[in-house]
Amino acid sequence: METVQLRNPPRRQLKKLDEDSLTKQPEEVFDVLEKLGEGSYGSVYKAIHKETGQIVAIKQVPVESDLQEIIKEISIMQQCDSPHVVKYYGSYFKNTDLWIVMEYCGAGSVSDIIRLRNKTLTEDEIATILQSTLKGLEYLHFMRKIHRDIKAGNILLNTEGHAKLADFGVAGQLTDTMAKRNTVIGTPFWMAPEVIQEIGYNCVADIWSLGITAIEMAEGKPPYADIHPMRAIFMIPTNPPPTFRKPELWSDNFMDFVRQCLVKSPDQRATATQLLQHPFVKSAKGVSILRDLINEAMDVKLKRQEAQQREVDQDDEENSEEDELDSGTMVRAVGDDMGTVRVASTMSDEANTMIEHDDTLPSQLGTMVINAEDEEEEGTMKRRDETMQPAKPSFLEYFEQKEKENQISSFGKSVPGPLKNSADWKVPQDGDYEFLKSWTVEDLQKRLLALDPMMEQEIEEIRQKYQSKRQPILDAIEAKKRRQQNF
């Protein structure tokens, strides 16, 4: 697939989309070549910029996604200008999707490469990748930005071997009035102790995640990956810092580098600038040492794509034979225009670009592990389900469940005194109202009186939540109509 890029080098370097390009339909400016997978909030495609011939990546985000988070991601990418951070070229509104045009990194993520080759990385390879990653983090931290989701899946390599930070879906901006953040954001196994404890954190939270990523590149998965993520969340702050499973396999310099990243006290943890001076990083070799593993991974990927294409072609032939025998294979697409017909097929629409397999970790965590030799494999990008909702980490679902329980407990506190103190009072579960049969008419009337103000409060909360999601979309559409590029 990459030979297209080599045979047709860009006529000139694309730096940013101009005003004229941004007012056109995206299909007039780009040719979409193939789907790469799923990123945070949307599908990612490989495309070619018609004017320059340059390959780009386009993230297509449905507007029902959290647009505020998407705008934040765009804003952070737009402010960055570093060879170690994925570049942002511009964005479009197309029907119900937001198209974000970004730099394309042909070798994929580090975790993709590990998985495709079914091999972990050597110390030399890790040192070279860490050096570029630290330069990217040094730049971000100088700009007062925290990435908050550093892991091998978010470190991309171009075909020359240069590493770049990507996926700013949860990145944050530090301001003078908010020196530390208190929100739990990130992927559980890579999260710093202070992030989990919600005691406030700053840029060095990324350094902890980098130390975990170093272990991930060396061993194929992060520490605690074999246990339930909720257990890991409680173990990370309480246990000593993790280390290698087999320390004897690694040099003293490498182990010391990881040790300096994984200091539990953020005040004593090394910064990106300091770690760039560490002997392990200073002795890193040039990016040329990564070319062999990149070529090997790309060869594996190409062979798999060819095998998938053969399967698709074979299925097409079978479907064609069936069409000759049975015209009933042509069906109308429900909800489409009356004149639209669609070929019924057993193949998924995305079968030629994605492979599904069972991971040893829950898929919603977005983590990546080395597959067993007999497993089929997939990229770090996850296939989105039919609801097109972004995957939610299980630890966030846990906290949301706790919040729901707190809301249920507060239900009883708002009930009038006589009923609240009644021994018969109980919190209702959805669909379970059998206990009401044993109540007196007086108790039922009191309960009815208590429900009305509670319902009004819930409706108001829902209305505010709806408005908070609706307004940014309206603002963005209005801004686009005025041809003001605010991204």
Swiss-Prot record:
<keyword id="KW-0067">ATP-binding</keyword>
<keyword id="KW-0547">Nucleotide-binding</keyword>
<dbReference type="GO" id="GO:0005524">
    <property type="term" value="F:ATP binding"/>
</dbReference>
<keyword id="KW-0597">Phosphoprotein</keyword>
<feature type="modified residue" description="Phosphothreonine">
    <location>
        <position position="340"/>
    </location>
</feature>
<protein>
    <recommendedName>
        <fullName>Serine/threonine-protein kinase 4</fullName>
        <ecNumber>2.7.11.1</ecNumber>
    </recommendedName>
</protein>
<dbReference type="GO" id="GO:0051262">
    <property type="term" value="P:protein tetramerization"/>
</dbReference>
<feature type="modified residue" description="Phosphoserine">
    <location>
        <position position="410"/>
    </location>
</feature>
<comment type="function">
    <text>Stress-activated, pro-apoptotic kinase which, following caspase-cleavage, enters the nucleus and induces chromatin condensation followed by internucleosomal DNA fragmentation. Key component of the Hippo signaling pathway which plays a pivotal role in organ size control and tumor suppression by restricting proliferation and promoting apoptosis.</text>
</comment>
<keyword id="KW-0479">Metal-binding</keyword>
<dbReference type="GO" id="GO:0005737">
    <property type="term" value="C:cytoplasm"/>
</dbReference>
<feature type="region of interest" description="Disordered">
    <location>
        <begin position="305"/>
        <end position="338"/>
    </location>
</feature>
<feature type="site" description="Cleavage; by caspase-3">
    <location>
        <begin position="326"/>
        <end position="327"/>
    </location>
</feature>
<dbReference type="InterPro" id="IPR036674">
    <property type="entry name" value="p53_tetramer_sf"/>
</dbReference>
<dbReference type="Pfam" id="PF00069">
    <property type="entry name" value="Pkinase"/>
</dbReference>
<keyword id="KW-0418">Kinase</keyword>
<dbReference type="GO" id="GO:0005634">
    <property type="term" value="C:nucleus"/>
</dbReference>
<keyword id="KW-0963">Cytoplasm</keyword>
<keyword id="KW-0460">Magnesium</keyword>
<dbReference type="Pfam" id="PF11629">
    <property type="entry name" value="Mst1_SARAH"/>
</dbReference>
<dbReference type="GO" id="GO:0004674">
    <property type="term" value="F:protein serine/threonine kinase activity"/>
</dbReference>
<dbReference type="InterPro" id="IPR000719">
    <property type="entry name" value="Prot_kinase_dom"/>
</dbReference>
<dbReference type="InterPro" id="IPR050629">
    <property type="entry name" value="STE20/SPS1-PAK"/>
</dbReference>
<dbReference type="GO" id="GO:0046872">
    <property type="term" value="F:metal ion binding"/>
</dbReference>
<comment type="similarity">
    <text>Belongs to the protein kinase superfamily. STE Ser/Thr protein kinase family. STE20 subfamily.</text>
</comment>
<keyword id="KW-0175">Coiled coil</keyword>
<feature type="modified residue" description="Phosphoserine">
    <location>
        <position position="320"/>
    </location>
</feature>
<dbReference type="InterPro" id="IPR017441">
    <property type="entry name" value="Protein_kinase_ATP_BS"/>
</dbReference>
<dbReference type="GO" id="GO:0035329">
    <property type="term" value="P:hippo signaling"/>
</dbReference>
<dbReference type="GO" id="GO:0006915">
    <property type="term" value="P:apoptotic process"/>
</dbReference>
<dbReference type="InterPro" id="IPR011524">
    <property type="entry name" value="SARAH_dom"/>
</dbReference>
<keyword id="KW-0007">Acetylation</keyword>
<feature type="modified residue" description="Phosphoserine">
    <location>
        <position position="414"/>
    </location>
</feature>
<feature type="modified residue" description="Phosphoserine">
    <location>
        <position position="265"/>
    </location>
</feature>
<keyword id="KW-0539">Nucleus</keyword>
<comment type="subunit">
    <text>Homodimer; mediated via the coiled-coil region. Interacts with NORE1, which inhibits autoactivation. Interacts with and stabilizes SAV1. Interacts with RASSF1. Interacts with FOXO3. Interacts with RASSF2 (via SARAH domain). Interacts with AR, PKB/AKT1, TNNI3 and SIRT1. Interacts with DLG5 (via PDZ domain 3). Interacts with MARK3 and SCRIB in the presence of DLG5.</text>
</comment>
<feature type="active site" description="Proton acceptor">
    <location>
        <position position="149"/>
    </location>
</feature>
<feature type="compositionally biased region" description="Acidic residues">
    <location>
        <begin position="313"/>
        <end position="326"/>
    </location>
</feature>
<dbReference type="InterPro" id="IPR024205">
    <property type="entry name" value="Mst1_2_SARAH_domain"/>
</dbReference>
<feature type="binding site">
    <location>
        <position position="59"/>
    </location>
    <ligand>
        <name>ATP</name>
    </ligand>
</feature>
<feature type="binding site">
    <location>
        <begin position="36"/>
        <end position="44"/>
    </location>
    <ligand>
        <name>ATP</name>
    </ligand>
</feature>
<dbReference type="InterPro" id="IPR011009">
    <property type="entry name" value="Kinase-like_dom_sf"/>
</dbReference>
